[in-house]
A protein has these predicted regions:
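C-terminal, loop-rich substrate-recognition/catalytic regions characterized by aromatic stacking residues
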Residues: 2-328
Length: 328
């Protein structure tokens, strides 16, 4: 989202709690979130379109659950006949996933999830009908899957995407579940191959507006490399759709508290410095078609400088990562 006067907001907060100054901060919404809208799938952003929204309480009574069932023709509001879908996804699925924790959160490099259509093409996908009106979500989407696998250890990755009329796809929320942790991280338990399990978990929190004419898309895979390590053996996942669903935290697009505009971002005057290096960050994917080997090369650019007043050298050195995997 856009830059805001974060320092001024912190000053208002601490003046209230430490100095007993009534800054009005406690009369404002408990939660303020940047509601993104029609964001293109890109590994780098200068800015994202959207607007600020607020809720006076959180959890908010204005958020309602809207359930979509996975079915034979995509997503539907009512259960359909049970259909079996089988996934054996490529080991390289996930190349458009971006970084789990972006290093340059200020948009310094290609670290965010890009266009999802290639990962979608190798996943089990369930698309909704084109939306007749805008649909906003705020919070965590809940997932229920009725599934079985053919190995004692397996992952399942679920992505909620914004499917656009031009064919592109933007990741809105996602989660990876290690199915041996289905009971909880406190009790790791291998799966029995062939046994059906009902698994429930939440996707990452999101504030996003799906606009009219776009489609909700649920994409399911057993791999998400290089964000997660591959399973010891390739996994075949069988999904039973009748008892599988997602539950969206839908927020009404109208109403709600008015948001006081943020002040412009401020910072102290910069000290005179001399730049030593300013190398760009990059992410390069190469594919050896003959061997099937895929390599990801990531470089975090160096950003060294010297503070002229006292000669202190600060900054980071360039770091590199190489990860590779071969299908099969």
């Amino acid at each position: 989202g856009p830059a805001i006067g974060f320092l001024q907001e912190m000053l208002r907060w601490w003046d209230y709690w430490l100095k007993d100054i009534d800054t009005g901060i406690m009369k404002e919404p408990m939660l303020r979130a940047y509601m993104q809208q029609d964001v293109p799938g890109s590994s780098w952003y200068a800015d994202c379109p959207g607007r600020w929204v607020g809720e006076m309480q959180w959890p908010s009574s204005r958020i309602s659950a809207k359930k979509f069932y996975l079915g034979d023709v995509g997503l539907s509001l009512t259960p359909t006949r049970d259909v079996v879908r089988v996934a054996v996804t490529p080991q390289t699925l996930g190349l458009a996933g971006g970084e789990w924790c972006p290093y340059g959160t200020g948009g310094e490099g290609p670290e965010f999830p890009g266009d999802q259509r290639f990962d979608d093409g190798a996943s089990i996908c369930f698309d909704g009908s084109p939306l007749r009106s805008d649909l906003e979500i705020l919070g965590a989407t809940k997932v229920t899957l009725d599934l079985s696998v053919d190995r004692p250890t397996a992952f399942v990755c679920v992505r909620l995407n914004d499917g656009k009329p031009d064919g592109s796809s933007t990741r809105v929320a996602y989660a990876v579940m290690n199915l041996t942790h289905r009971i909880g991280h406190h009790k790791v338990q291998n799966l029995i191959p062939g046994r059906r399990y009902r698994v429930k978990f939440q996707l990452s929190d999101a504030a996003y507006s799906f606009i009219r004419g776009h489609r909700l898309r649920v994409a399911i895979s057993t791999t998400y490399w290089p964000m997660i390590w591959p399973s010891p053996e390739p996994v075949e996942l069988t999904l039973h759709t009748k008892n599988s669903s997602i539950e969206l935290p839908v927020r009404p697009s109208r109403g709600g508290p008015k948001i006081k505009p943020f002040l412009a971002a401020e910072e102290g005057p910069p000290m005179p410095t001399t730049v030593l290096s300013n190398e760009p960050s990059k992410n390069v994917v190469s594919h050896d078609v003959l061997s099937g080997r895929v390599e990801v090369f990531t470089q975090r650019g160096a950003d060294g400088l010297v503070i002229e007043e006292h000669g202190l050298e600060v900054g980071g050195r360039a770091t590199t990562e190489r990860m590779s995997i071969t299908e099969g």
